Each structure stands twice: as structure tokens, then as C-alpha cells.
Amino acid sequence: MLVNPATKYRPAATVDIPDRTWPGRTITRAPRWMSTDLRDGNQALIEPMNPARKLRLFEQLVKIGLKEIEVAFPAASQTDFDFVRMLIEERRIPDDVTIVVLTQSREDLIRRTVESVRGAARATVHLYNPIAPAWRRIVFNASRDEIKAVAVSGTRLIKALTDAMPETAWTYEYSPETFSLAELDFSLEVSDAVSAAWQAGPGRPMILNLPTTVECSTPNVFADQIEWMHRRLARRAHIVLSVHPHNDRGTAVAAAELALMAGADRVEGCLFGNGERTGNVDLVTLALNLYTQGVAPELDFSDIDAVRQCVEHCNQLPVHPRHPYVGDLVFTAFSGSHQDAIRKGFAQQQPDAIWEVPYLPIDPADLGRSYDAVIRVNSQSGKGGMAYLLEQVHGLYLPRRLQIEFSRAVQAMTDDTGLEASADDLYGLFRREYLARETPLRYVSHQLASDATGATAITVQMERDGQPCTVRGTGNGPIDAFIDALDLPVRVMDYHEHAMTAGADARAACYVEVRVGDSPTGFGAGIDASLVTASLRAVVSGVNRHLQAGFGARAQATQTASASAATEA
């Protein structure tokens, strides 16, 4: 790279509009959309689509709700010409859809293009020619007047040919290609000459499409260019002002949005931003940006994964996992703080209320996407993500302090493996840490009774280091009685329970925070169809975790438990 790039590159020209109005405007309705996936998108593919893939994508575009679809450059190849004829002759074009065909301003190409759409109910012929200084000088060696004459002569020929076919509802579109790099006064001169040649007026509108053929400036400069043209165009009331942003600088979406604020009525682009070089503006992102602002986009992406699968198949190009709204990871949070906020947002979000879940600008369900991948756990994650997955997939609602305790084990596992932990991975770890802790004590069965004072009496069949034993105790409820039976210095510090499922076969989960002797507190967990059994299993789990960890009370607890087992055996 150059130390001083100004010796090789010059900044884009700016537009002097002291009273520009677009910065104070908002977009309150959807523009007219035109998909150029089958033309601009197709010509940019390493392997252009065959007719079957083109037809599949055409049908997907119709299903989404697009009413203007650029289907081909018919004069470029017999394949493109035949595809247009197939759509017309097999009556595959819905009555409310207009197909668009592109041509350069050469007589033979124009005649071939118009012939390709003979018999169509509705069609737009789209003419373009480059007008910027570099193209005039380097590519065509032509003057401004010569370039304007090319556009006007092509327009007149298209008018004559289409006027001779009144059975078709014709629309004319003109693009001064390289508009974003051209002088504004010349762009206006050519555009006005073209609209005059077409005789744009009441009942005879035309589309003027202003492209960023090569994106060369910040989006605000393009917005200024659009507002400048919007204010000065002759016959503006009979012109649909369209934009066709490319993404060379990565700001095509912003350029399109600001252009709409500046007076544009229509946007051309491709699904997921396919197109030459870095692509055309992404119609999906534009539409869903409107949707998240409460503006109906008039396009249907309620099954966005199906749309993506179709586009990936037809284009033979993958959609990036970070692509807005549709990528595999765009609704995924690995960060602990993000996960915690999302989890709390889901818990508070009410049906039919304004969407306010942190970090999620749109409800994935609106796009037909599930919540399964919203929170995923790796070494960067915290307790919130782990807790959310256990809740959603396995029905375990861990109390907050248990979340903190278990998150340490999760962190150790993900640090060790360097891999993402799935919901099943987390459940397996939880089972190993809590549910399957059966040494040195293992619960087998129990019987409950009440004595004359109303206290609970319990008899528990257990194993101690693999040896059967029976312990008995009394207390104020089953847990208190069980602790009495264990004859250990155990205190229950906290207790939580919940049903994991509904119905006759429902299971209960219990979480017990215990302290053995003067050791730190720790949790145990148990699951069973019986709530009492689940709570007893949780106590055993908590005690075993303390004993296996070698806390201060271990020696005393082991000695006492051994004595009890010997007495009762």
C-alpha cells in the first residue's frame, strides 16, 4: 500500500445542496422492488444458472411477492432468449408480475430483446449505456453529445417497436450506467432527453434507474445525488425514480435507504446481495430493516431458511453465517452477558407486545426460525446461556446460585475441549456432576409414616460404598427426617423444586443446597416421578459431592455414616 494514497486515488466529488431535505425524512412505506437475481445476479456467477435453476429461482421470487423481475439479457445468448420465451409460452408469469428484459443501445440487440417478450401480458424493456467520463474517454472515445445520442436513439427505437405491439402493457426503463461517477448536469441532460424521446406523460410513465454501478462514495453523497436529480428532472410526476446500488464499499444497504429518503421510489437488487464483484444491494436486508421499524415491506420472508436454501442451490454460492437476518449465527449469542440479557428478555416478553428482547432486533419466529440456536455455549459463555439451554431443551430451571456453581464446571469443560457445548453436552455434564453422584451413598428406596406426634418417620434403603444398609429417622417432613436418619452434620440451606413436564407421567426436579459440617455450601439435584423421592435424591447428591470433594467435614461424616450403616445392617 502507498504511504500517501492521494498520489493515486482522488476522493469522490460531493454535491452542494445547502438545503438538502433527506436527513430529516424517514421511510414510512415500502418502495417498489425489482429483483435482478436472474440477470445481474446470474451473470456474476462462476457457473451461470441452467434453465431449471433459473425457473426455480423465478418461482421463489414470485412466491416472496416480487412484482417486477428482471429475467434475462435475451440478446446475449440463445439460452436467455429461450428462457424468456418459455416463461411466456408456458404461462408461468402471474398476471400481476411484470418481467424485465435488459438490452444495450444497439439496433440488433434492441430488436432481439423486444422480440423475446412478444406475447407477454406485461413487460419492461430496460435500456442502458455508460455515461461517466472514464467510460466516455477510455471505453468509447465519444463526446457527451454522442453518448446522449446513443441513449435517445435506442429509446426511440424501443418506443416504435413497443407501440407496434399494443397487446402488451409496456413499461420503459432507462439506466444511465455509471451514474454515480458521472457529472450531475450531464446525467440530468441525458435523462431529460430520454424521457422526452419516450414521451413520458399521463398514462405513459417510465422508470429512470440511477445506479451506483461502482460504489465510490459514502452513502450520504449518493443521497445528495438522488435529491439533486429528484428536484430537477423534467416530467418528474411521470417518472418512477429507481436506484440500483452496488456494494463495492460495503454500504449498498445504507445507500439505498438514504436514496429512498432523498426521493427514490424503487430499488433494484438481489436476494442476499448477489451480483457483480461485491454484489448488488441485498433486498432481504432492506425489506427486513423496514419490517423491524414497523413498516410492512410487502415481501414475505416468513420462511427465510427455505428462501436461503433455494438461493444457495440456484446460485451455487453459500450465504455467509453472519449475513443479516438469515445467517446461521445472526441470532446466536455466545457471550455470557448477552445470553443473560436474552434469557431475561424472553422471560418477560409477552405475546402481542412490542418486541423488546435485548440483542435481537427481530423475533426469529417471524422469519420461521426457531429459538434453538439463539443461545449457544462455549468458553466465552456465562451462566445465562447454560441455564437457558437446560430450560428450553431439558426442562431444568436451575436456581441462580446453582447456575453460578454449575457454570464453573461448564467453563472447565469448554476450556478443556475448546469446543461449543450443546444442550445435550450440558445435560450430560449436569448428570455427571449432580444426578449420577451415587458414591459413597446411593439411594435405593424409602417408606414414610407419621408417629403419634405428627412427625414424619422415614425408613430408607441405601448403599454405602456398595454395601446395603437401612437408616431410619424422624423429623418435620421427609427431608428433615432423612437428614436425621443419615446422622450426619448436614443442614439444608435452600430448596427448590419444579415439575419438568405436565400430565400423568410428569417428573419433578429438586435442587437442595446443603452444608456438611462447616464446609462451604454446595448443591445436589434429583429427578424422579415422585417429588419426595426427587428431594431425597437431591440430598444424597449434595452430600456425596461434599464427601467426594474432601471438604473439612469428610472425616467426621464418613465415620458417622459407617457407624450408622454397621448398626442397621
Swiss-Prot record:
Gene3D superfamilies in UniProt: 3.30.160.270, Aldolase class I
Keyword Transferase: yes
Pathway note: Amino-acid biosynthesis; L-leucine biosynthesis; L-leucine from 3-methyl-2-oxobutanoate: step 1/4
EC number: 2.3.3.13
Gene Ontology CC: one annotated term: cytoplasm
GO biological process, one term: L-leucine biosynthetic process
Entries under SMART domains matching the protein: LeuA_dimer
Primary subcellular site in the record, as a coarse category: cytoplasm
Catalytic activity: 3-methyl-2-oxobutanoate + acetyl-CoA + H2O = (2S)-2-isopropylmalate + CoA + H(+)
Top-level class of the enzyme under EC nomenclature: transferase
Single GO MF annotation: acetyl-CoA C-acetyltransferase activity
Cofactor(s), by name: Mg(2+)
Subcellular location: Cytoplasm
Keywords per UniProt: Amino-acid biosynthesis, Branched-chain amino acid biosynthesis, Cytoplasm, Leucine biosynthesis, Magnesium, Metal-binding, Transferase
InterPro entries named among the record's database cross-references: 2-isopropylmalate_synth_dimer, AIPM/Hcit_synth_CS, Aldolase_TIM, IPM_Synthase, LeuA-like_post-cat, LeuA_allosteric_dom_sf, LeuA_N_DRE-TIM, PYR_CT
Binding site for Mg(2+): 40, 244, 246, 280
Region (Regulatory domain): 437-569
Ranges for domain Pyruvate carboxyltransferase: 31-305
Oligomer status and interactors: Homodimer.
Physiological role: Catalyzes the condensation of the acetyl group of acetyl-CoA with 3-methyl-2-oxobutanoate (2-ketoisovalerate) to form 3-carboxy-3-hydroxy-4-methylpentanoate (2-isopropylmalate).
Family membership noted in the UniProt record: Belongs to the alpha-IPM synthase/homocitrate synthase family. LeuA type 2 subfamily.
UniProt-recorded name of the protein: 2-isopropylmalate synthase
